């Protein structure tokens, strides 16, 4: 088995972490909005910022895996 395929597979695992993180954040945002509906605008803006940061991790993993597959 080629080592770059193994390395690319491990780099893609960052997407799993991002998915779990966004799922937990979504659950927290929904629960917070249900408890305090008047703060939904602030909760939504914080959630979008957090989801974007979490998704950046998945994008970095994807870019690294593509580089490992096609460049190295």
Swiss-Prot record:
Subcellular location: Cell membrane
InterPro entries named among the record's database cross-references: ATP_synth_csu_bac/chlpt (IPR005953), ATP_synth_F0_csu (IPR000454), ATP_synth_F0_csu_DDCD_BS (IPR020537), ATP_synth_F0_csu_sf (IPR038662), ATPase_proteolipid_c-like_dom (IPR002379), F/V-ATP_Csub_sf (IPR035921)
Any Gene Ontology CC annotation: proton-transporting ATP synthase complex
Keyword Lyase listed: no
UniProt-listed SUPFAM superfamilies: F1F0 ATP synthase subunit C (SSF81333)
Chief place of localization: membrane
Pfam families, per the entry: ATP-synt_C
Site note Reversibly protonated during proton transport, residues: 55
Keyword Glycoprotein among record annotations: no
Gene3D superfamilies listed in its UniProt record: F1F0 ATP synthase subunit C (1.20.20.10)
Stretches that traverse the bilayer: 5-25, 52-72
Keyword list, A-Z: ATP synthesis, Cell membrane, CF(0), Hydrogen ion transport, Ion transport, Lipid-binding, Membrane, Transmembrane, Transmembrane helix, Transport
Molecular functions (GO terms): lipid binding; proton-transporting ATP synthase activity, rotational mechanism
Superkingdom per UniProt: Bacteria
Bilayer topology: Multi-pass membrane protein
Family per similarity comment: Belongs to the ATPase C chain family.
Role according to the record: F(1)F(0) ATP synthase produces ATP from ADP in the presence of a proton or sodium gradient. F-type ATPases consist of two structural domains, F(1) containing the extramembraneous catalytic core and F(0) containing the membrane proton channel, linked together by a central stalk and a peripheral stalk. During catalysis, ATP synthesis in the catalytic domain of F(1) is coupled via a rotary mechanism of the central stalk subunits to proton translocation. Key component of the F(0) channel; it plays a direct role in translocation across the membrane. A homomeric c-ring of between 10-14 subunits forms the central stalk rotor element with the F(1) delta and epsilon subunits.
Subunit structure: F-type ATPases have 2 components, F(1) - the catalytic core - and F(0) - the membrane proton channel. F(1) has five subunits: alpha(3), beta(3), gamma(1), delta(1), epsilon(1). F(0) has three main subunits: a(1), b(2) and c(10-14). The alpha and beta chains form an alternating ring which encloses part of the gamma chain. F(1) is attached to F(0) by a central stalk formed by the gamma and epsilon chains, while a peripheral stalk is formed by the delta and b chains.
Name the UniProt record assigns to this protein: ATP synthase subunit c
Organism: Clostridium perfringens (strain SM101 / Type A)
Gene assigned in the entry: atpE
């Amino acid at each position: 088995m080629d080592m770059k395929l193994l390395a690319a597979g491990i780099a893609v695992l960052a997407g799993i972490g991002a998915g779990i993180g966004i799922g937990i954040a979504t659950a927290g945002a929904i629960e917070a909005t249900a408890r305090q509906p008047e703060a939904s605008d602030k909760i939504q803006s914080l959630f979008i910022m957090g989801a974007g940061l979490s998704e950046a991790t998945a994008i970095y993993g994807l870019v690294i895996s593509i580089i490992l597959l096609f460049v190295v």
